[in-house]
Amino acid sequence: MRNRLARLIVTLSLLLCSAVTAQAQFNLLPEIRGGISARGVDGGGNLFDPNRISDANVELLFAVPDINKWSIIGELRPHLGATVSFSGQDSYAYTGLSWTIQAPVLPVFVEAQAGGVARSSLLNGNQTDPARNFGCGIGARVAASAGVNLPLGASIIATVEHLPDFGTCGTPQRANTNVGVRLGFRF
């Protein structure tokens, strides 16, 4: 587990370093976000219990020239992220498209995300483990966020994400709903 975590951190660091270099030349990486989240909030219990906070998240949002021609309002951006669990649950990487809508006058925004997710159970599960099934190890991810823009290009963001498995993990609907808070930095 620690070895995989170390590899994930090194990989994300290398991506971050190369992306910052690319950003300086092409402005392909206009925003980086990081934060913490509580997993499985749809299972009941106290949402504000600090023991539920068991994940760390990093997300990179990219700028693609001319992609916003498809959006009447807001900003469309591809994203790439990873969530690491410190409680022995699945970690996962995800990618997809973010649609951010800024309020006209106020420094607030809302965002919707949709895409795919690859869970660590895909790599560390037994060959016959249902966690390796398509839709379980690799599946869908949707998220919704609300944020406040802070000075100097920073923002604070509250996020709810849902990772459905459509019953492919061998158990009826092992879907996961997580809530978190992140700090974003625009360049």
Residue ranges with predicted function:
Residues 23-29, 64-76, 102-110, 153:
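Short loop/turn motifs that connect adjacent beta-strands in outer-membrane beta-barrel proteins
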Residues 56-58, 175-187:
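Outer-membrane beta-barrel "beta-signal"
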Residues 60-64, 84, 99-103, 148-150, ...:
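Residue-level signature of outer-membrane beta-barrel architecture
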Residues 1-27:
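Cleavable N-terminal export/targeting peptides
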Residues 39-40, 111-143, 147:
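Outer-membrane beta-barrel translocator/channel fold
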Residues 25-62:
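Outer-membrane beta-barrel initiation region
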Residues 44-52, 82-93, 104-106, 168-174:
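Solvent-exposed loop/turn segments connecting transmembrane beta-strands
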Residues 32-44, 74-86, 158-164:
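Transmembrane beta-strand segments that form the barrel wall of outer-membrane beta-barrel proteins
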